[in-house]
Amino acid sequence: MAQGTLYIVSAPSGAGKSSLIQALLKTQPLYDTQVSVSHTTRAPRPGEVHGEHYFFVNHDEFKTMIGREAFLEHAEVFGNYYGTSRETIEQVLATGVDVFLDIDWQGAQQIREKMPQARSIFILPPSKIELDRRLRGRGQDSEEVIAKRMAQAVAEMSHYAEYDYLIVNDDFDTALSDLKTIIRAERLRMSRQKQRHDALISKLLAD
């Protein structure tokens, strides 16, 4: 069976990364593509399901996993830990399923060190003006928070060149088409096609 591909997807807040990934998944069968499910120490929110939205663990369990080097990457955010399990990712990839990991540039660097075969995609907004409009469109942040998010966005975008692919999300449908094209091209790589069609190739080359 052909090994699945791990896709690292990063973008500044407001670039439309999550919307693009969710739209992509709606066009792909579950046996082809999944989103990575992270471990976290924070409490479940209403409606969240263990194993579907996150793997919820306590701090001691999480620290034990860190000690076992069980994570491809992990970080602390506002007192809670979040991490991507190497075992979970590898088990899914071994079934031939592609996995999407929505993560920032720092987490992406950690994963590249441990899984250099992963493919990475960076998504940019079409302009700072449009990014500002999208951030304001949420209608829930103060001017101070928006200014902070814009500064964080610029810092995040400065790492775009570290990625394999670059998508500019100006028109959503075009950006989604670009994302699909990347996935299709990766699935046609020699290494994957050779595994997928091994029996056929053997028959074609038999004396």
Curated annotation (Swiss-Prot):
Keyword NADP among record annotations: no
Gene that produces this protein: gmk
EC class: transferase
Taxonomic path: Bacteria, Pseudomonadati, Pseudomonadota, Gammaproteobacteria, Enterobacterales
Membership in a protein family: Belongs to the guanylate kinase family.
Keywords for this protein: ATP-binding, Cytoplasm, Kinase, Nucleotide-binding, Transferase
Catalytic activity as recorded in UniProt: GMP + ATP = GDP + ADP
GO MF term set: ATP binding; guanylate kinase activity
Family matches, as SUPFAM superfamilies: P-loop containing nucleoside triphosphate hydrolases (SSF52540)
Function: Essential for recycling GMP and indirectly, cGMP.
Annotated residues for binding of ATP: 11-18
UniProt xrefs under InterPro entries: GK/Ca_channel_bsu, Guanylate_kin-like_dom, Guanylate_kinase, Guanylate_kinase_CS, P-loop_NTPase
Record-linked PANTHER family: GUANYLATE KINASE, GUANYLATE KINASE-RELATED
Full protein name: Guanylate kinase
Source species of the chain: Salmonella paratyphi A (strain ATCC 9150 / SARB42)
